[in-house]
């Protein structure tokens, strides 16, 4: 919603983080006030459909312009109650026109970084479900906080089993994810790549 932004982004990937918008109701430049209100409605709708996600606070101050007389400072204590979760049970990853190679415990190579693609993944015990994907190939990254890496891991699509075997811990996975993130807490010990045979 900043000046000059085309405002075509969507909030779908915000499922696992707290997100807040504070906007002056009279801040009409670049249609910021209307876009902020629209995002509020979109986030309300997403949270209604998925109550465990999309924690948000959208405040439109009707009589304020771009300067909100510091009313937007309320965002700081609200955001402070959230903590990063590197291993959410459910992920909604919607790529924008600027694409990325990784998101939480999912990763794609350069051939599968498709603008506007959406991946929804969830995990429960030793099973990971990815009901739909409009990419051909996806890497799932794992560690011992997520599941038991000494036991077989099942990865299912809507049409069948994509993987069912033990996923070994490797130094390569640890090194790659440490290099990417620069964060020891963000390392993953194992990874497996699955392919959708029927993907476009």
Feature names for model-found ranges:
Residues 28-38:
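Conserved alpha/beta-hydrolase "acid-adjacent" motif
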Residues 20-30, 62-63, 132-134:
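Conserved strand-to-loop "acid loop" that flanks and positions the catalytic carboxylate
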Residues 1-12, 16-17, 31-33, 48-49, ...:
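Mobile cap/lid helix-loop segments that gate and shape the active-site cleft of serine hydrolases
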Residues 40-200:
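Alpha/beta-hydrolase-fold serine-hydrolase catalytic core, especially in secreted/extracellular enzymes
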Residues 13, 18-23, 56-60:
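Structural recognition of the beta-strand scaffold that forms the well-ordered cores
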Residues 6, 23-27, 86:
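Surface cap/lid and interfacial helix-loop subdomains adjacent to catalytic sites
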């Amino acid at each position: 919603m900043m000046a000059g932004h085309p405002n075509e982004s969507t909030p779908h990937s915000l499922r696992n983080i707290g997100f807040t918008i504070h906007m002056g109701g009279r801040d009409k430049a670049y249609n910021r006030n209307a876009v902020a209100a629209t995002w509020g409605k979109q986030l309300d709708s997403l949270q209604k459909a998925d109550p465990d996600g999309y924690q948000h606070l959208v405040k439109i101050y009707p009589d304020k312009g771009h300067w909100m007389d510091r009313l937007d400072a309320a965002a700081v204590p609200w955001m402070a109650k959230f903590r990063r979760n590197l291993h959410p049970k459910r992920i909604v990853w919607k790529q924008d026109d600027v694409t990325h190679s990784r998101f939480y415990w999912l990763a794609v190579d350069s051939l599968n970084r498709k603008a506007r693609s959406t991946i929804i993944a969830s995990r429960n015990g030793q099973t990971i479900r990815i009901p739909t994907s409009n990419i051909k190939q996806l890497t799932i990254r794992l560690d011992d906080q997520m599941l038991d890496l000494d036991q077989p891991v099942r990865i299912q699509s809507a049409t069948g089993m994509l993987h069912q075997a033990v996923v070994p811990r490797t130094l390569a996975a640890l090194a790659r994810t440490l290099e990417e993130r620069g964060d020891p807490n963000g390392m993953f010990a194992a990874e497996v790549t699955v392919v959708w045979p029927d993907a476009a």
